[in-house]
C-alpha cells in the first residue's frame, strides 16, 4: 500500500495525545508527546515493552518543563515500572537533551551510535560566548522567544 508524494497524510492513530500523556499505539508500544518551546511545538517519544519494563526512545529537550513532565509520567502511569534502557536516535537537543538526567534517574543503560554520541558531546562542549550567541540567534530565527 504505497501512495504518491501528493497524497494526503494518513495518520495511523485516530487522536493526538496531550503533552505528557501516554497513549498505546500498538501492543507493547506507548507514545509520549513532549512539549517544545519553539515553533515545532512537540517531540514524539516512544516506550517499547522490554524485559518487564520499558525501553525509552529519545528524551525531549533538556529543560525544567520537560523534567517535570517526565516526573509526572514516572509518578503516574509508569509508577513502579522499570526503564530498562534509553535509546537515542540522534543528537538533536530535543531527542538527546535529557539523556544524562534520564539515565541517572532511571539507572538504565544508554544506547546510541558512536557518531551521534560524539556529535552530542562536541556540540555540548562548544560553549564559548560566541557560540552561545550564534545558537541563540539560530533559535530566535526558528521561533524560540528570548526567554
Residue ranges and their predicted role:
Residues 19-81:
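Conserved beta-strand hairpin/beta-sheet module of binuclear metal-dependent hydrolase folds
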Residues 14-15, 100:
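Amphipathic, soluble alpha/beta structural segments
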Residues 10, 60, 88-89:
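A generic secondary-structure micro-motif detector
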Residues 71, 75-147:
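Active-site HxH/HxHxD metal-binding segment of metal-dependent hydrolases
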Residues 1-14:
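N-terminal presequences and immediately downstream first alpha-helices
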Residues 14, 37, 91-92:
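Charged, low-complexity surface patches
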